[in-house]
Amino acid sequence: MRVCDVVSNSVWYDPRVRKQIVEYMNNNVDVVCVGLKDHRYDEEKMKNVPCPVTLADIDEKYKKPLSKVEVLFKEFNRVKKLREAILSQKPDIIHANDLDTLTAACQAAKKLDCKVVYDSHEICVENHQMRGIYKKLNALCEKTFIKRINKMVCVSHAAADYFENKYAIEKPMVITNCSLKAEKTASNDKHDGFEILNHGVYYGGRGYDIIVESAALLKDYPEIKIALRGFGAMEDELRKRAEEIGNENVIFYPPVLVNELIPYASKSKVGVAITENTCLNFELSVSNKIFEYASAGLPVIMSDIPEHRYLNEKYNFGIILKENTPECFKEAAIKLYTDKEFYDVCAKNADRLSEEVNWETEFSRLIEIERSWVNG
């Protein structure tokens, strides 16, 4: 069975695609990858991608500020380049990652008479960054080509319901962005105090400002420490606000490599996974951090969106915030700090979540279906 894994970036920094490649290879699947040479292309890091990779390159004239008409021509050029790269691989199955690869994948599949898996990492047309003619074009592409695929995959049950209802298709298979079994880490070497961690890229809608503000409300609990690990556009603003509050229990840790996130998280006591539903895409998503914290054995304080509720009702591994406010966060932090029995139950259940929901188990379900297509 030959699978062509298709993505519209330079592959090496896309964690979901890299996990796909590794799991295909672990299951003795002949996997090749097709991508696009983008601004993050790194020749040295490409050597770490464990399968053959073909990177298409869009024409130079489209690598500059473009008019609306030129944007359309750039899209046609991008689809053409991806399609040609896929055709050169002659796969049995095309695994199209996200909407921006779907058109090329379906066009190539028609010529090759092969199967297509559409793996939607998000609800692209409902992303707050998708606007104007670009949004209309993508909505048209999804509506047209989603009827031509053989299987759809998405990252949450809430998103699966959305796609099923919107396009009247078979309910997509849910394969969450969970962690690898091998990444599971438990640590008795905890940081001082009761440390509550939010790690990732510092940008709006992810709760970093909320937890920093909560520090002002937690001064009567000096053992509770608010920790942030990462980088991003909000860092200066967050540091400034922490200084204004004057609470020394707000800690900023430097960023670490992706494969170090879980071991470092295991040194904290609680994880934070806040997604503010500023658009439908965010509302129907699931925070990858939940699975990272669970793999580190941490209870989680999380926002009230459908998939977080679904997971917590099933596994009872943390607290769903009533509202995304410093006041509600303070209540959750104090509950986990003062109620040791509740904390221990949540920690045990987080461990169970990571045991039952891991990448190897999740992705093997798709590989089984793909084998049935090829083997008849």
Where in this protein do the model-derived segments appear?
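N-terminal strand-loop element at the rim of the active site
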Residues: 5-14, 23-73, 159-166, 174, ...
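Donor nucleotide-sugar binding/catalytic pocket of nucleotide-sugar-dependent glycosyltransferases
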Residues: 35, 125, 139-185, 252
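Conserved acidic donor-binding segment of nucleotide-sugar-dependent glycosyltransferases
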Residues: 314-315, 319-326, 335-340
